[in-house]
Amino acid sequence: MTDLAIIWTNGRGDIAQDGIDMLTDDSLTTDVTISLFTDRRALDSDTLPDGSDDRRGWWGDSYRDRPIGSRLWLLSREKATPDTLERARGYAEEALEWLKTAGRVSAINVRAEQLHQGWLYLYIALTLPDGSVIPYEFKAAFNGV
């Protein structure tokens, strides 16, 4: 499926352009970026980072079997502890699982690290059905995940 191409630069997603034209993309890159960095609705059991009752999410998920996005935003006020990094890894895997269910990939491998103070690094390897592997690296500020 072709979507607007999303690029990840300086810790933020943006629509890819060529001059004044918006570019399209049918690779996994846009799917992965949207899956990771769109706010998925928090579960009732999740603790919300700002203490509000705003569980975020996309209203269209009310009509879908599979919600869009990830719960990485729940980590926005967390300190980078081993537990937080494990949650980040789990949230990323959860967000990307639909690629496996849809047959777009056969395996998903996610690693979460903090290499610099206040930054979350996600290393993702997606194995395609033909066995080839596509690597992705994302960097996001913990105060803006």
UniProtKB/Swiss-Prot annotation:
Keywords: Host cytoplasm, Late protein, Viral baseplate protein, Viral release from host cell, Viral tail assembly, Viral tail protein, Virion
Superkingdom field: Viruses
Disruption phenotype: No tail is synthesized.
Pfam families (alphabetical): GP46 (PF07409)
Entry's Gene Ontology BP terms: viral tail assembly
Location relative to the cell: Virion; Host cytoplasm
GO annotations of cellular component type: host cell cytoplasm; virus tail, baseplate
Protein's UniProt keywords contain Membrane: no
Swiss-Prot/TrEMBL induction comment: Expressed in the late phase of the viral replicative cycle. Expression of late genes is activated by the viral late transcription activator C.
Primary location class: virion
Its job: Component of the baseplate. Probable connector between the central and peripheral parts of the baseplate. Probably involved in tail assembly.
Subunit structure: Part of a complex composed of three DNA circularization protein N, three baseplate hub protein gp44 and three sub-complex wedge (made of two copies of each baseplate protein gp46, gp47 and gp48) that forms the baseplate.
UniProt-recorded name of the protein: Baseplate protein gp46
Organism of this sequence: Escherichia phage Mu (Bacteriophage Mu)
